[in-house]
């Protein structure tokens, strides 16, 4: 499995007994089922939707996220990609732009 570039996150994950260290056939089957379920459900989303994607993510590839996003019929949907982010953005060394984008998106829709 890919590991974050943040040294503190690497240490944390290496000591986490539940962190997936290898991808098995069962893992890939579960991902395939989840992907098809996500695509089917995407077509039913009509509420405001913010979709964020790390372009270095190898677990949820950007093309698959974009495919799901394109199926969302909501009239208020936003897709933001981050070139430097991987899958787990909470492990990013600097996630200030992501946090700013999320807060701005929520504030723009707050009453």
What is each of the regions a protein language model found here?
Residues 1-40, 47:
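Alpha/beta-hydrolase
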Residues 78-111:
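Catalytic active-site module of serine/aspartate enzymes centered on a nucleophile-bearing elbow/loop
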């Amino acid at each position: 499995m890919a590991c974050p570039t943040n040294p503190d996150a690497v240490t944390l994950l290496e000591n986490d007994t539940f962190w997936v260290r290898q991808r098995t056939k069962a893992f890939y089957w579960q991902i395939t089922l989840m992907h098809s379920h996500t695509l089917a459900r995407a077509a039913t989303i009509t509420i405001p939707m913010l979709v964020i994607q790390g372009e270095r993510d190898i677990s949820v590839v950007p093309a698959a996220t974009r495919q799901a996003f394109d199926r969302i019929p909501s009239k208020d949907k936003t897709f933001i990609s981050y070139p430097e982010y991987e899958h787990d953005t909470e492990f990013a060394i600097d996630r200030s732009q992501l946090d700013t984008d999320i807060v701005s998106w929520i504030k723009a829709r707050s009453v």
